[in-house]
Amino acid sequence: MEDLLRVGVISSTHGIKGEVKVFPTTDDMNRFKKLKMVTLDTGKEQKELEIENVKFFKQFVILKFKGIDNINDIEKYKGKDLLISRENAVDLAEGEFFIFDLIGLQAEEEDGNSLGELTEVLQTGANDVFVIKTKQGKEILIPYIDDCVKKIDLNEKKLVVHLIPGLVE
């Protein structure tokens, strides 16, 4: 199955002509200007939608889809995810990763001591924070900074970290 990445969530309708307010889950909402198609995940099926128009309002993206011209045709999709294929995703700079690819990495210390699995990435504004769940069910919060994150290897599904004093009880 092809990897799909979530770029937004339909939060509400906008007007009566089929437009929707989308809460973007990407760090740059201007990326929506470059998109031609998105996949709507209805929960039961996935529908390809062609983007006809893109506008911005506060922290939202306003999208108009081709062939959807009525509020009644789109209202039922509130809360549903908008996805794109990996090939339509933006190119990332070195050291940048899709959160989707990081979830599930096995975290270990520099000496090889296993810590657990990366289960979540918190976006704090200053820097991201990796949530590592240990085998004992505890959580370790690792800031995504050079002092702490030493290596990310997606091929080996491994995250190597340096635990600075105070990160673990």
Curated annotation (Swiss-Prot):
Keywords: Chaperone, Cytoplasm, Ribosome biogenesis, rRNA processing. One of its GO terms (cellular component) is cytoplasm. InterPro entries: PRC_barrel-like_sf, PRC_RimM, RimM, RimM_N, RimM_N_sf, Transl_B-barrel_sf. One of its GO terms (molecular function) is ribosome binding. Residues 94-167 form the PRC barrel domain. Pfam families: PRC_RimM, RimM. GO terms for biological process: ribosomal small subunit biogenesis; rRNA processing. It is found in: Cytoplasm. Disulfide bonds: none annotated. Its main location: cytoplasm. Gene3D superfamilies: PRC-barrel domain, RimM. Belongs to the RimM family. An accessory protein needed during the final step in the assembly of 30S ribosomal subunit, possibly for assembly of the head region. Essential for efficient processing of 16S rRNA. May be needed both before and after RbfA during the maturation of 16S rRNA. It has affinity for free ribosomal 30S subunits but not for 70S ribosomes. Binds ribosomal protein uS19. The PRC barrel domain binds ribosomal protein uS19. This is Ribosome maturation factor RimM. It comes from Lachnoclostridium phytofermentans (strain ATCC 700394 / DSM 18823 / ISDg). The gene is rimM.
